[in-house]
Swiss-Prot record:
Source lineage: Bacteria, Pseudomonadati, Thermodesulfobacteriota, Desulfobacteria, Desulfobacterales
Family in the record: Belongs to the SAICAR synthetase family.
Organism: Desulfatibacillum aliphaticivorans
The entry's keywords: ATP-binding, Ligase, Nucleotide-binding, Purine biosynthesis
Listed name of the protein: Phosphoribosylaminoimidazole-succinocarboxamide synthase
An example Gene Ontology biological process: 'de novo' IMP biosynthetic process
GO MF entries: ATP binding; phosphoribosylaminoimidazolesuccinocarboxamide synthase activity
InterPro entries per the UniProt record, alphabetical: SAICAR_synt/ADE2_N, SAICAR_synth, SAICAR_synthetase_CS
Pathway recorded for this protein: Purine metabolism; IMP biosynthesis via de novo pathway; 5-amino-1-(5-phospho-D-ribosyl)imidazole-4-carboxamide from 5-amino-1-(5-phospho-D-ribosyl)imidazole-4-carboxylate: step 1/2
Catalyzed reactions per annotation: 5-amino-1-(5-phospho-D-ribosyl)imidazole-4-carboxylate + L-aspartate + ATP = (2S)-2-[5-amino-1-(5-phospho-beta-D-ribosyl)imidazole-4-carboxamido]succinate + ADP + phosphate + 2 H(+)
SUPFAM superfamilies registered for this protein in UniProt: SAICAR synthase-like
Signal sequence annotation: none
PROSITE patterns: SAICAR_SYNTHETASE_2
HAMAP family with a match to the protein in the record: SAICAR_synth
Length: 299
């Protein structure tokens, strides 16, 4: 079985800031971003890592960062461990394939969510109010149906363990400023459209996703964090797509479904996950990487 990394311990580096999945090391003039194999569902970190998950997330993100270069710059400096600062290279066996040296930027204060299909919380909202995040939709939509128009539905950025809160575009404009909000919306829709079209050709429907952006010292908005991964997006197999029901997926929806089945209360600590759930989730992540990126970004 593949080895897994629950959290990184790199003694010669500063103490990292740990998020749900990533450990961020402040190296002074750059960050070392390491994707662990932690998995969170319903904003709760599960106690069992998914082997190789962090590597898959990193390689998929690197693939998309490259694909999207003509739309927006990104924060990647290098993903080659032998180009990292010398003090990092001793940890090559841990860092290889799951880490990126990234530029320091000021993160934007909102999450940029894009929805191309109606699913998850969007579907729940539609059933109650025929709207998603305050945006009215036509009646008669089925679960998992392609939306008449791709939606930009921003949210607040919650602290670890808290829930992101959906907000209107107007509220987003209040938080980041009208001009920046428009720029974030336009970039998000452009990236999603290009990504969804390319993924569709490779047999994956990207139902929805979440982007993060940052601002450089010279005022440019760039793409940061992760891009169109099974953690930040809903990936559905195109050959099994059937509107009117919840879809099979390449992402952690498999874990979410299991947690709903056991009536998990969505409060920490997360429950132990059965080996079968861990294995199947790992397989789904690997399958998504292979379909999207082929062998160029294999782990």
């Amino acid at each position: 079985m593949a080895s897994s990394v629950w959290q990184t311990e790199l003694p010669d580096l500063p103490e990292p800031k740990r998020g749900k999945v990533r450990d961020m090391y402040d190296l002074g003039d750059a960050y070392l971003m390491v994707a662990t194999d932690r998995l969170s569902a319903f904003d709760v970190i599960m106690p069992d890592p998914i082997p190789d998950k962090g590597k898959v997330l990193t390689q998929i993100s690197l693939f998309w960062f490259d694909v999207m270069k003509d739309i927006v710059d990104n924060h990647v400096l290098t993903a080659k461990v032998d180009e990292f600062p010398v003090k990092c290279r001793q940890y090559a066996d841990i860092l290889e394939g799951r880490s990126i040296l990234v530029k320091k930027v000021q993160p934007q204060a909102i999450e940029c969510v894009v929805r191309g299909y109606i699913s998850g919380s969007g579907w729940s909202s539609y059933k109650k109010s025929q709207s998603v995040c305050g945006i009215s939709l036509p009646e008669g939509l089925k679960e998992s149906e392609k939306l008449p128009k791709t939606l930009f539905t921003p949210s607040t950025k919650a602290e670890l363990g808290e829930h992101d809160e959906n907000i209107s575009f107007e509220k987003a404009a209040e938080i980041v400023g009208p001009e920046t909000a428009e720029k974030l919306r336009d970039l998000s829709l452009a990236i999603y459209t290009k990504g969804a079209d390319l993924a569709n050709e490779k047999g994956i429907i990207i139902a929805d996703t979440k982007f993060e952006f940052g601002t450089t010292d010279d005022g440019r908005i760039i793409l940061i964090d992760e891009v169109l991964t099974p953690d930040s997006s809903r990936f559905w197999p195109k050959d099994q797509y059937e509107p009117g029901r919840a879809q099979d997926s390449f992402d952690k929806q498999f874990v979410r479904d299991y947690l709903l089945e056991i009536k998990f209360n969505k409060q920490p600590p997360g429950p132990k996950l059965p080996q079968e759930v861990l294995d199947k989730t790992r397989d789904k992540y690997l399958q998504a990487l292979k379909l999207l990126a082929g062998d160029a970004y294999s782990i």
